[in-house]
Amino acid sequence: INSMLALRDALSSGYDEALILGTDNSVNEGSGENFFMIKDNKLITPELITVLDGITRKTIISLAKDHDIETIERKIDLNEVYECDEAFFTGTAAEVTPIIEIDKTKINNGIPGKVTKMLQNDYFNLIRGKHDKHNEWLTHLNKT
């Protein structure tokens, strides 16, 4: 219910989504998504202590590894997010959604970043069966 209330509050304040924070001002997740940021070509995401261990989250971490992008799971202070190079949400419904602004602070000059777009493209290709790796993650259905 906290997620629903946070989203309702965000929407009524003119935002598209909520960023759920811990009592220590650490970033946990969106109202229904996992949170990632890119800083110095490293993929950073909150540790699993406070967030859902999402399938899409695991997929993005694997895809980043395919590109030799280091993934760091740790506590993220909200102030760090304002200084990040890129940010995005992941989830079953969100898939890979770039974040271009948080609290009126533009991320990457208000445009999706190159790493975000690369991982988003890889993810879309993967779920459509057009990716070179991880074919074992898919169940192909026969046309009837």
Task: Please report, for each region that a protein language model flagged, where it lies by residue.
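Helix-start/capping segments and mature chain N-termini
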Residues: 1-144
